[in-house]
């Protein structure tokens, strides 16, 4: 089952596709990392058969036998408020009136605490406890066969897999095609020219894309954005898991490159 705004690549694997709403098409709250609870109001209606996520989930829950009879998003928020003491003082009506309130907020008279642990931390000494972390080497290291390090990440213009930003004409016009970033030194060693194509290979796969020189990279490093399905960076990356966090090592692996 896939619930999304667009027919993304993931939808090709789905048995059921549920058309969902975008951020500007639904009511609710957004809580940022600064602990500010902000009220959001739908600016435009959902198109076609698309529905707000809450009502899709509510109806599925009812189909599974749950006693979910919410009629407005405020009912869900108030239920959540009853289970979270930190937002106890932030009622729905208060959000409608103020637009946003920062938690912890204990009661209606609390303006909201933008700074926590003002006097002390909740430790025996009252001070923050800092723990040194040990550096752990990646699972796969460069060698004579694959002498370079591949790093993957986002481009400024495209978010995650680009399901929204690659459908935004202005952003997609700036960065329309897959690209591989290579250091000036490695461009010279490999005989590459900016604007040409380069093939990057790992023990798991290969891809070919447009090459761009990047002086911010050190010799031996290359960077590939992971937002392009037509040159998917994860064809190359290592799926080895971190032993503690169980996070796959998609950001680092050994590769080699050559002119395409």
Question: Language-model segments: which ranges?
Answer:
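Flexible glycine/proline-rich, aromatic-decorated loop/lid segments
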Residues: 5-41
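Short beta-strand/loop segments at the ligand-binding rim of alpha/beta enzyme cores
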Residues: 1
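Short helix/loop capping segments that flank catalytic or ligand/cofactor-binding pockets
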Residues: 10-11, 27-28, 40, 131-132, ...
């Amino acid at each position: 089952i896939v619930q999304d705004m667009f027919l993304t690549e993931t939808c090709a694997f789905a048995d059921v596709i549920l058309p969902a709403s975008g951020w500007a098409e639904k009511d609710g709250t957004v809580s940022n990392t600064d602990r500010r609870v902000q009220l959001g109001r739908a600016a435009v209606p959902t198109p076609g058969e698309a529905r707000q996520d809450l009502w899709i989930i509510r109806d599925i829950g009812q189909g599974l036998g749950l006693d979910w009879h919410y009629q407005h998003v405020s009912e869900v928020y108030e239920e959540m408020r009853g289970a979270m003491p930190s937002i106890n003082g932030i009622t729905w009506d208060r959000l409608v009136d103020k637009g946003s309130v920062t938690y912890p907020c204990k009661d209606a008279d609390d303006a909201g605490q933008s700074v926590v642990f003002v006097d002390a931390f909740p430790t025996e000494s009252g001070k923050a406890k800092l723990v040194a972390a040990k550096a752990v080497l990646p699972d796969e290291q460069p060698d004579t066969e694959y002498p370079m390090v591949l790093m993957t990440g986002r481009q400024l213009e495209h978010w995650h897999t680009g399901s929204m930003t690659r459908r935004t004409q202005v952003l997609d016009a700036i960065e329309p095609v897959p690209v591989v970033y290579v250091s000036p030194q490695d461009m010279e060693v490999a005989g590459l020219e900016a604007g040409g194509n380069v093939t990057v290979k790992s023990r798991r796969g290969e891809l070919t894309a447009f090459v761009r020189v990047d002086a911010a990279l050190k010799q031996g490093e290359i960077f590939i954005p992971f937002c392009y399905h037509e040159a998917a960076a994860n064809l190359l990356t290592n799926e080895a898991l971190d032993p503690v966090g169980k996070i796959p090592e998609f950001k680092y692996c050994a590769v080699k490159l050559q002119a395409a």
